[in-house]
A protein has these predicted regions:
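Conserved helicase RecA-like core
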Residues: 1-193
């Protein structure tokens, strides 16, 4: 299986969870996300060589699109003909971050007969187009959380947003959470602190 994530951080989180549950199963997992330090060529080469050595012994690869494509193009004997499953985690973000061309090239390497799982928080035209590229139309099954509902947002859910200058963001979030300690709150932000 190959699991594609849009960022190194998300791939790392997925890998950490897989390691926790993996100890109860007989499969191996590998993380190929590229070097952390783009300024040190020697470290990048060492990371790449280490990844090359681990790929043949791995059942499940967790990777970023760019690094997977680099291995597909440069790692001798890296054969993906036996891949049975492709997981596109946060497919909308993969496309938003400019990996469309890389993704299309990756799909060209993979066997047509495979299971593809596409996870996306949004259903954009790009995500639907990606689904047509990567999924056999005869076997498409769309799972929507609110398919049968007239209204997607529950009536008792209160949604709001605040536009805050970046320098006040942390204080604003802290103040909001502190004043709503007894409430169930989810905060979505475009950037991390």
């Amino acid at each position: 299986a190959i699991v594609l994530s849009p960022t190194r951080e998300l791939a790392g989180q997925t890998f950490a969870v897989l390691r926790k549950i993996g100890k109860f199963h007989k499969f191996s997992a590998g993380l190929i996300i590229g070097g952390q330090n783009k300024n040190r060529k020697a470290e990048q080469n060492n990371d790449f060589q280490r990844e090359q050595q681990s790929i043949p012994t791995t059942n499940i690869l967790i990777c970023t699109p760019g690094r997977l494509l680099q291995h597909l193009e440069q790692t001798p004997y890296f054969n993906v003909d036996a891949v049975q499953m492709l997981v596109l985690d946060e497919a909308d973000r993969i496309l938003d971050m400019g990996f469309r061309d890389q993704l299309v090239r990756i799909l060209d390497y993979l066997p047509a007969q495979r299971q593809t799982l596409l996870f996306s928080a949004t259903q954009t035209k790009d995500v639907k187009h990606l689904a047509t590229l990567s999924i056999n139309r005869k076997t498409v099954e769309y799972v929507g959380v609110h398919d049968q509902d007239d209204v997607v947002t529950p009536e008792q859910l209160k949604q709001s947003y605040v536009v805050v200058p970046i320098e006040h963001k942390l204080n604003c979030v802290y103040s909001f959470l502190k004043s709503h300690l007894k409430s169930k709150t989810i905060a979505f932000m475009a950037t991390c602190f």
